[in-house]
């Protein structure tokens, strides 16, 4: 699976790299898990609704969520598009 960050999500990820190694590690673990099983596992994966329909979220912490969308066929042709990794998707 390929992993792609939106510009916004990449900036958020770099914020964590600079400020909190524990959260950075958690995000990396979630991304690794998503690459093997996008819709099940830790972080309580849940499909989002309304304007984010088609996207999923996983809990990074009590406050922060990883928001992503998976497209393509299983395996090498799949891509995970990460659009957020800081704050809650309603914020």
Residue ranges of predicted features:
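Generic recognition of well-ordered alpha-helical segments
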Residues: 11, 25, 29-32
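Enriched for short, Lys/Arg-rich terminal
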Residues: 2, 15-24, 59-65, 69-91
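A short, surface-exposed loop/turn module that caps and links secondary-structure elements
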Residues: 32-58
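A short, hydrophobic secondary-structure junction motif
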Residues: 31, 35-37, 86-91
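Short alpha-helical linear motifs
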Residues: 29, 49-52, 68-72
């Amino acid at each position: 699976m390929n992993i792609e960050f939106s510009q916004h999500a990449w900036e958020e990820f770099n914020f964590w790299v600079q400020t909190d190694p524990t959260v950075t590690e958690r995000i990396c673990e979630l991304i690794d898990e998503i690459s093997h099983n996008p819709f099940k596992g830790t972080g309580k994966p849940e499909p989002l609704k309304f304007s984010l329909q088609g996207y999923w979220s996983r809990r990074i912490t009590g406050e922060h969520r990883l928001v992503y969308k998976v497209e393509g066929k299983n395996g090498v042709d799949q891509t995970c598009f990460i659009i957020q990794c800081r704050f809650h998707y309603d914020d």
